Amino acid sequence: MALTLLVLLLVLVLVAGAWLRARQRKRWRYAEERQVALAQIRLLRQLIEQVQRHRGLSYGVQSGERSLEARLWSVNQQVRQLFERCRVYQPRLHWLPSWHLALQLWERVNQPDTAESPEHLLSLQTDLVQALLDTVSALAERFDLVCLGRLAPQAEGQWLELLHNIELLGQSRAIGTGIAANRQNLTVW
């Protein structure tokens, strides 16, 4: 009887230990995945920033300001490099429809000899930034990086709101660049 009780107690301790170890491993994996998600979000934030610059410069160039072409080429190369760096995360991003949309939009924007109007290209690039923001939002919500799905007023969720507000400013800057380029190239102002 004592031996049976001792064996039962030993089995119970082993099961509890295995359960605690599995729980600890699960937490560790989740924390590791969350760190990877943060690295992805940092990279996507850089990509958003460069796409916004690309949008403003390309709208300015297409509106007639040829002095911006060298800067546009440089930013275009940076955007290409950032998309290339995102390939590391492709297995994780593959499941996000917004990422696929972003890739398709970049291909359309980056086509040489695009016969698109400046306004249509501006719209495509704005859609591209929105797709990237949606990708960031999906990652943030999946790994609980925003409190209560952005409903909480705590600072933990404000970073995502800040990205959306920066995009509104970026749209305004792009339009302003185009307007300035158009007015500068008018014969009568």
Predicted regions and their residues:
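Hydrophobic alpha-helical segments
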Residues: 2-189
